[in-house]
């Protein structure tokens, strides 16, 4: 388990207040960004979340192909480009897929889709550009773990990496792909999910870094017109354990388009109000990035 008292010993009120002011002075406590102004906040766009905050677990839910991984990659790249060290838990795809998805965002040819990269049907200029993009990816302070693992083992890895060199963001893609631990052998699946969420929440608090946890809904399995975290298996425990709950809903009218619109809903926000009306952003499928409608605020260079 994650012993809270081992990770976070008692502190005085003076020390807690000093930490609070330290976070306030550090961009209002934000230690990571989504890479999208509508979610990070800017002088032009009313922030929905204000970024990813230290010590908080954010659940990012949506259907398969709805942009969850692209959102996670956008946040990871934005954080890494700003100098923050990122741990990306790739439970669904191999490290090579993660690398190509990140590289696609740096390519200048159009469309730089992962499928085209895999096909190897590229011109000489495109290969040269891909090599340039690959060098940009290689320079990012980004760690990728694509090994099958349990929640406890992943958290132990994160703690070890953080003690070696502090992390700024931890990403899990995605929750339901964690393996069962021995302690879960006789537990119901919903109990296992609840314990895994608690482990990640404790990790965020102990390391005082934001943890972005992706949650997959069943395709077409939403029980309501607009899906919520309760449409995921074990959704009640997930909703309860998260500090923030963000839902991505693709706009059906742009389904299949190279750049489609996605509505972002904030169903739960620690210390703030939810955003039930939704905020539209763009899902650039080819580049595997999210950006604002005007395309101006993403920190990723295309």
Regions found by a protein language model. Name each.
Residues 42, 46-47, 78-166, 180, ...:
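Cytosolic-facing regulatory segments adjacent to core modules
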Residues 177-180, 247:
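Residues immediately C-terminal
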Residues 59, 144, 169-171:
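Structural motif
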Residues 108, 114-115, 125, 151-170, ...:
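C-terminal regions of RecA-like/P-loop NTPase motor modules
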Residues 91-93, 213-216:
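Conserved H-loop
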Residues 174:
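Walker B catalytic acidic pair
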Residues 3-112, 132, 275:
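The Walker A/P-loop phosphate-binding site
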Residues 85, 208-210:
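Proline-centered loop/turn at the N-terminus of a beta-strand
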């Amino acid at each position: 388990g994650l012993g809270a008292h081992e990770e976070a010993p008692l502190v005085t009120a003076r020390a807690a207040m000093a930490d609070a002011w330290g976070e306030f002075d550090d961009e209002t406590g934000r230690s990571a960004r989504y890479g999208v102004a509508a979610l990070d906040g800017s002088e032009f766009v009313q922030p929905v979340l204000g970024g990813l905050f230290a010590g908080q677990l954010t659940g990012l839910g949506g259907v398969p192909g709805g942009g969850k991984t692209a959102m996670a990659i956008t946040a990871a790249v934005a954080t890494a480009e700003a100098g923050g060290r990122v741990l990306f838990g790739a439970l669904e795809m191999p490290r090579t897929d993660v690398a190509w998805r990140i590289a696609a965002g740096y390519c200048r040819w159009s469309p730089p889709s992962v499928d085209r990269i895999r096909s190897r049907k590229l011109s000489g200029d495109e290969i040269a550009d891909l090599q340039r993009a690959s060098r940009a990816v290689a320079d990012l302070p980004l760690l990728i773990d694509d090994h099958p693992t349990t929640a406890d083992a992943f958290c132990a890895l994160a703690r070890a990496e953080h003690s070696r060199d502090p992390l700024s963001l931890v990403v899990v893609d995605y929750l339901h792909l964690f393996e069962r631990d021995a302690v879960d052998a006789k537990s119901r699946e919903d109990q296992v999910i609840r314990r895994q969420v608690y482990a990640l929440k404790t990790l965020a608090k102990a390391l005082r870094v934001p943890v972005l946890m992706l949650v997959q809904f069943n395709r077409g399995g939403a029980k309501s017109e607009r899906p919520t975290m309760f449409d995921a298996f074990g959704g009640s425990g997930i909703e309860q354990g998260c500090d923030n709950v963000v839902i991505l809903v693709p706009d059906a009218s742009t389904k299949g388009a190279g750049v489609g619109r996605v509505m972002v809903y904030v169903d739960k926000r620690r210390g703030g109000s939810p955003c039930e009306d939704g905020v539209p952003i763009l899902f650039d499928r080819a580049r595997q990035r999210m950006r604002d409608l005007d395309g101006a605020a993403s920190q990723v260079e295309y």
